[in-house]
Amino acid sequence: MVSRSSETSEGPPPPSKIPGTPAKTRLSRLNSSPAKQDKPKDDRVVKSSAKDVAELKDYQLGDCLGKGAFGSVYRALNWNTGETVAVKQIKLVDLPKSELRVIMLEIDLLKNLDHPNIVKYQGFVKSAETLNIILEYCENGSLHSIAKNFGRFPENLVGLYMSQVLHGLLYLHEQGVIHRDIKGANILTTKEGLVKLADFGVASRTTGLSESSVVGTPYWMAPEVIELSGATTASDIWSLGCTVIELLEGKPPYYNLQPMPALFRIVNDDHPPLPQGASPAVKDFLMQCFQKDPNLRVSARKLLKHPWIVNARRSDSVVPKKSTEYEEAVKSVQEWNEALRSPDTGTLRKPYRYDAQGAALRPEMAPSRYTPTKDILPSPVSKHVTDRFRSPDSTEEDNWDDDFATAISPSALQLPHLRPQDNFGGMLSSEKLKAFASLDGTVLKSEDGFDDFDDPFSQQPGESDPLRTIRPYSAKPTGMENMSQQTKPTIAAMHHNVPVLKTPVPPLRPQRPTSYFKENSVEDYSDLISANEDILDDKLSAFQDIDEEGSDISIPSPSKEVVRYQASPDHDEDHQPQLRKRISVKRHRSAIEIQKFAENERDEDFSDILGADEVALDKPESDEGSDRSTLMLNSKLSNNSWLGDQDDEDDPFAQLEEGLDEVDLEANIARDKYARLRGQVEGLVSSLKTSQDEDVLGEISEQLLTVFCDLPETKNIIISAHGMLPILEILDICRRRDIILCLLRIVNAIIFNDYEIQENLCFVGGIPIINEFASKKYPREIRLEAAAFVQQMYQTSTLTLQMFVSAGGLNVLVEFLEDDYEDERDLVLIGVNGIWSVFDLQGSTPKNDFCRILSRNSVLDPLSLVLSRVLDEEGELAEIVEGRIANIFFIFSQAENHVKEMVAERTVLHRVLKELKRMTPAHQITMLKFIKNLSMLSTTLDSLQNSNAIDVLTDLLRSTIKRPHFREVSNQILNTIYNMCRLNKSRQEDAALNGIVPLLQKIVKTERPLKEFALPILCDMAHSGKVGRRELWRNKGLAFYISLLSDPYWQVTALDAIFTWLQEETAKVEEHLLDNRYDKMSFTDSIVRCLTISKANAFENILEPLQKLLRLSPPIASTFARPDLFTRLGQKLHHNKAAVRLNLLRIISSICDSSEEQGGLLAKYGLLEAIRELEHDPAILVRDMAGKLIQSNERSESFSLEKRKPGMRRKSTSTTPPGYLANQSAPATPQINRFNQPKAYFDGRESQRHPRPSLSSSALALRPGSRDGTGPSLSAGLSSSAGPSRNRLSRGVANRLSQVELLAEEETRPSSSLSRRRSILPQRRRPTHADSDWAS
């Protein structure tokens, strides 16, 4: 990290007059920002100045900007230019030799990169203790420090920053560089508001942990990186999404977890939790970043086109073109956090396109919405609203609109206090009806004050009869779904003052005759009509027609209103006005309500009742309730018992006497006994009172129980006598156990298999009273009765079970489980079945809630004990109970994480694991699922390990390998072992010691579906410690990995495992890889075939570990100088991804460096022209690497020409003593290259490669050794001139790097990649011992 962790100082401090004096540090502190001066003393101590490095003579180190595990970052001043830079010091002690050389090579390449959104690498200087990387200085620190000091970022600012980050990231990806460590601390800012990516490429290598463990902090890491599948450009996109969450929330995802649990969650979860308050655009952006499959993750180029990023750039383009300045960014962050902390709902700025005042106005608008208006008169606006939601007009004959068809005011219909019982306040009196029937259409003024209401629709101009006003719209019989559409014309007509009389209204056609059930509602109102006799005649004739068809004045129902009016083409428009007026003359039903019960002289005929054939009753729908009585009456009449014959002497009870049996004396006695019994039981029940003496209550309860046992039919007597409540009242206060026992038996007998009585008992509060007797303080007999009651509650109906649980029944069930199985087996089994029934309940309550309640009582501990006892028994019942216990365990493993943590007790797990082998196969698989689900939570892994889960599961896997259910068992076991061993070396070694390796190898060879579960465990074994690798050696693990190279899905993982193993035990692994005594394909052939047949994604991913492996082991690299490999590499040299082209060039370079012909291989295998084309590649790093290969080829050709003309070459006259060679760190003169290269300490150019005829013992002595300190097996006969303490370095690295980097310690001059001026002195090369070797 190059940033200042907690300061915002402006500009570099003025240089001290005397370099190296403490005054400079004090002055820099005085010139720092107030934010820094307010820091406590402890922080200022941390930011101490660096110890002067003699090799950094052109720089003066200042205060510390940040510290990490491998070093610190200091601000420094360049004495020559006055430029302020950042110097990252890395301790060499913490770096492996191979990593140091890689870093120095990479820095020399990365310093060529230049983009406004990445931090510039300026070079490096190597000292005896540290490697000093010189970087561009960003004065305003990182986004992490801004968030730490000022709070969370608003979305628009995050979008603006992410736009710049994506531009920098896109540039790096186009250059073939993977950042690997994107987070807020590695995104630095400048005063101009620019953000720059830091710590990409090389610097990220220095933040990792040793022993091939997971690199860096886990919270930003992609799942494929955690699983050691290799980092790609898609891994940076995942980290970018985590950085967005970090800036929005102030913390990265899973920040509340420890690193290892966080790694576990990243791999297992579908995606990290998204911020709750994020906008949909941000959530969509994050979901694009968090695609689990790296192949489906979008690229940086596509993310730049995301709407959120585009809008952020567009909003920024409104202001001047330059980026957001630092002060403005800080101000916006402060305002945003103040808004988050403020109690009111208003916002400081207008969010997107929402109304800025909307949030503030909503609380004020809310009360007015529910405030009732003081004036009940409908306003013009309210009339439109109410009309829109009016009920559809009734279309029966009993139509109120027909009664008001002339001049009634619609506003009167809206009055809530008018009731039909009082004729609507007099509006429907006979006087009013006379006025409605008059021709002038005027309305008499009401005495009740109804004339105060204005009626804008009472007098509407129109073309039709002036007597008509508002009419109901005639509906077609289409059903209820068209009701709203049928009422629209009427409403529209009222709004536009257009009469609706043009709509044809057909005559009424009732569905059924009702003349038998009502008085004739047609009366003569001729005295009400003034002068028009013709109209009266027409009205009367119309009523006559209607009466002939029958009319219906039944109470209208909503389901019939729409179908009353039926359109008929037989009636034209001319008949409609008269029909309207005729209908309106009728009296409303409310006016004759009382008269319908009066007899009608014409209704003396009872033929309809007697069921005469000539009269057909059309039973109305509303009379369905009288079906039984009507049918019974007709059946009686059909028997002619009293009406069919007029003879008065006939006995009306003749039929009754015929049906009587003979007098049965025994039946009479039984009835008498039952009557006496009923009286006795009712007397006993009435005596059950809490005020009775306990002795009396005891006698009563015993008598009642005796009677009930002798005659179970007395159950109904007790219920009818309301005996349940007295029994519950006595049970609530009684303490005599004999009374309690008797009453409990009575209750259980009454409620047995009768869910209605059970529900009634629950409703009156019987459950908590009886549950009390399940406690252990009561004797066994009482507890058994209480248990029988509990059993009835949970197995009869869902409702009783729900009420049982709500009354605290779960605690009762747990208490049953805790009893001794030997003594109280029935109680224990009732508890097991009860808990199973609770989980089997299909109700609205989530099972997770039951799990949480039961986990507080540690229910799985007694359940595991019960499981052990049940497995000792045989029979169907034992198997059922075993299955139910296994299902209960499985349900607990599906609950929330808190429940899993509570149930993952060591004693429970140990007991369950021990009983696994004894369980039946089906239930065994269920219990294995329970263990697997627990293993998916990182906090339970220690408990599983302490319960010997790995040992037990491995043994179970071995014992079931030949059984029919092996596939299901191994599926669960392998998942569990994988979850436990992943990212944990101790558990990996534990599994290896228990013999998991040969089992997994056998599964991989035989079981294809299980191969996907076994291979991850096997490949992770190479990353474990010495114990795991020893088991791999014992089971030919290296040969197994080589065989995996032929699998396109696992070749990348296998090659990464081989490379990791080679790092840990270099000499031994290298020897086996070079040995071709294996019967199968050699390692080199496997790699060549892998590169030849691999698909696009696999080919890209395999290049990274392959180039690392070849760079680490030159002897292995030398075996790859094959024409078939170079042909394949040449086909891919023009790949569209820069990272692929760069890795291919690195592989070719490693092979050339390790071979005798070196750069000559390019011309030999026809790659020279293709690499010459790459010298013009758009990617800077590719161009630079191609140029170095071309120069290597030129040097090789030049050397071969010199070798053909030995007379032209002068032999060396002096040699370098071995002691001097072992201690030097740099040549005495800056220039170290021979063929007119730029004279620099280290500029990444290829040093001269010296051909060697073979890998001699002295060459092997220079190769890197293992991390465990073992040397190569071929180094026994080394010459004494090499020195025993000399570090083993690879020959390829020795050829590629200058002599500056060959030795670990330097005392004379530092190695550096910084450019220096050419020396004006004559260039002379110091002769070396190697020169004398090959020159002679």
Curated annotation (Swiss-Prot):
Belongs to the protein kinase superfamily. Ser/Thr protein kinase family. CDC7 subfamily. PANTHER family: MITOGEN-ACTIVATED KINASE KINASE KINASE (PTHR24361), PROTEIN KINASE DOMAIN-CONTAINING PROTEIN (PTHR24361:SF433). The active site is at D181. Residues 1-10, 1253-1264, 1272-1285 have a biased composition (Low complexity). InterPro entries: ARM-like, ARM-type_fold, Kinase-like_dom_sf, Prot_kinase_dom, Protein_kinase_ATP_BS, Ser/Thr_kinase_AS, Ser_Thr_kinase. Its cofactor is Mg(2+). Residues 654-682 form a coiled coil. GO terms for molecular function: ATP binding; metal ion binding; protein serine kinase activity; protein serine/threonine kinase activity. GO terms for cellular component: cytoplasm. This is Cytokinesis protein sepH. It catalyses: L-seryl-[protein] + ATP = O-phospho-L-seryl-[protein] + ADP + H(+); L-threonyl-[protein] + ATP = O-phospho-L-threonyl-[protein] + ADP + H(+). Its EC number is 2.7.11.1. Required for early events during cytokinesis including localization of cytoskeletal components to the cytokinetic ring. Keywords: ATP-binding, Cell cycle, Cell division, Coiled coil, Kinase, Magnesium, Metal-binding, Nucleotide-binding, Serine/threonine-protein kinase, Transferase. ATP binds at L65, G66, K67, G68, A69, F70, G71, S72, V73, K88. The keyword Coiled coil applies. It comes from Aspergillus niger (strain ATCC MYA-4892 / CBS 513.88 / FGSC A1513). Residues 59-309 form the Protein kinase domain. Residues 1-46, 368-402, 1194-1336 are annotated as: Disordered. SUPFAM superfamilies: ARM repeat, Protein kinase-like (PK-like). The keyword Transferase applies. Residues 1213-1236 have a biased composition (Polar residues). One of its GO terms (biological process) is cell division. Residues 36-46, 384-393, 1194-1205 have a biased composition (Basic and acidic residues). Residues 1315-1327 have a biased composition (Basic residues).
